[in-house]
Amino acid sequence: MEKNHPQQQRRNFLKGSLALGAATLMAPVATMASSTIAKGSEEAFGISVGPYLQTTFGNEMSILWITNKNAASWVEYGESADALNLKAYGESKLGLRPEGRLNCVTLKNLKPGVTYHYKIVSKEVVDFQPYKLTYGTVISDTGTFVNADSAKEHISFLMLNDIHDRPKSIPFLLELDKEKKNDFIFFNGDIFDYQTDEKQIIDHMLQPCVDAFAKQTPFIYVRGNHETRGKFCREFPAYFQNVGRAAFTLGPVRFVILDTGEDKEDAHPVYAGIVDFDQYRIEQAKWLATEMQSKAFKKAPFRVVMMHIPPRYSGDAHGPVHCTEVFEPLLNKGKVDLVLSGHTHKYMVHQPAQGKNNYPLIIGGGPKEGTRTYTKIKANRQLLSAVMFDDSGKEVGRVEVRP
């Protein structure tokens, strides 16, 4: 595999981010002393963040929110703001409905193309005794969303990547999107430097998303290698509907999302023998091979794969090399129309190259001003287009594919 400059650039970035700690990272971390937000009994019951929407379509929508104390929660919804006559709860396990602070309620069997109004409701659990449950304050918040028709003719979405604990970049880059019309926002990994605690997740991603779009437009999120790091990395997935692999259809596109894992070898001393990403990628490759044989994949006018570490052109570290070994042969055989990635911190468009990638590959930029990008993807049955812009709004790359 060819050796490129991106790996060294990433190392320089990481060194720089440590030096910047006092200004950009250490201050937030200093306020994140506890790994879970502990709330004293004197604090009023409330919503810490949310609601925020996530989905992989198929006439379902997940509504998530976090309360500052344990609660029983549900969603009331309907096609009119004055008639929220439907009710949904979080997934029951072993006959028990959820009771806690992290809430995820999935609305199912929604009507295609219909606007839904919803209200999240949480009822504080003041005292939980074996035969007596005492409730306290009830709180709520409202929102609306359109349930996208999976068979719609035209789709559009926006990709962001490699934000690296710079929360102001999220609304800044979204604001540059002139059309402001997206079926979803896609976060392609490394939104954080590493996982510290709940406050970091709220302050550096969830709250900026809620403020900008996430109460009415869903986002989809896959981990980058940095989300696999830090003391809170094992708790991190509970704050989202999904941060791993997925496959779904929207309009003329079959989407496949791969979780590329860590870029260091599993035996690296910093992981102390508690990771297994090589096997994880191998298992995903088997899953990908099965997905590529599915009718949904084969019959789609376009096939788009989204993965944080690119299948090539990202240096010679262990993770990128392993991604090339296990994923690229499948991508080349599977008639993939476009791959969207990040990781290198250097934006680039790689057109198909004989003996390498049979598909166009867009790699988004980095976290620093002047390197940040957003990528706008649109598709109908005749054309798939992806245009990458830098943080001045200037076009810096384009791919157009026809069936």
Question: PLM ranges: what are they?
Answer:
Residues 1-8, 22-26, 34-35:
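N-terminal secretory signal peptides
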Residues 43-66, 73-77, 248, 348, ...:
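Binuclear metal-dependent phosphoesterase catalytic core
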Residues 44-50, 55-74, 79-99, 112-115, ...:
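N-terminal active-site segment of His-dependent metallophosphoesterases
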Residues 100-104:
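Short S/T/G- and acidic-enriched coil/turn segments that sit immediately N-terminal to beta-strands
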Residues 106, 117-147, 199-297, 326-335, ...:
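Extended active-site neighborhood of metal-dependent phosphoesterases/phosphodiesterases
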Residues 107-111:
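Short, flexible loop/turn segments at beta-strand junctions in immunoglobulin-like
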Residues 159-161, 185-189, 219-225, 305-307, ...:
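Active-site neighborhood of phospho(di)ester-bond hydrolases with catalytic His/Asp-centered motifs
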Residues 295-315:
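Short acidic, glycine-rich surface-loop motifs adjacent to enzyme active sites
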